[in-house]
Amino acid sequence: MLEPPKSYNEMLPMLHKATFITTFIFYLSLVIYGYMPLVGINAKYIPPVKDYEEFIKWILTFGILPIASSVFWSVISGVLDLHNNVAKIIGIRKMWDSHLIIKPLAKIAGVTRKLTTDESHKVMSKLYYPEVKELKDKHYVELFWNKVYYFWVFFEHTVIAFVTILIISIAKLTNIFSVTGSLINLWLWIISLVAFDFLIFIASVKPRTESQVRQIPDSKIKEFFNNNNIF
């Protein structure tokens, strides 16, 4: 999980595993500090796993919620493509593609106007992705995925933490279950995560994206725009 991926397809299973681990640690902390109830499980329902009995028993001393929630969010991460869909909903993907990829490519081609949605889609799917895939110097691609992977890990954790803390806040206000911890600390954690995500994006993801775009030959960019009548 700590070894960075070399492609998007390599990144996905690693991201799901990272989501499982970060979620488990997060929910474990929530139980320890009184934000979530300790929901026990009868020992007879614990399957015998050789060499891991003590470890499993230790995990379950904190209740079933941390491990169950980790499994749940890891599945959601994979089935719903959580990082990608949330990023689209809140506009991160559009901003990323538009300002860091499409606009620089259009500038090289001498196009200063804003591209239409169809033109933008064509530039991404027919020019950017194919050309990046064919880059001979994979160093730039690997550096890109190195930074993007960690950004998505923290981004998914931020999304999961936000949803969880929202539920906890509602639960405390409506007395659905006992919450002894301070809600202020939880929302400060969300603010810290958002700030950290922004820092990673600006300091690492942005320059790596721009660097990768620059590896596409100017001649191919201009040829693509001319052939597709994007002026």
Can you say where each PLM-predicted feature lies in the sequence?
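Loop-to-transmembrane boundary segments
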Residues: 7-22, 119-171
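Charged, low-complexity, helix-prone segments enriched in Lys/Glu/Asp/Gln
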Residues: 141-163, 185-190, 194-215
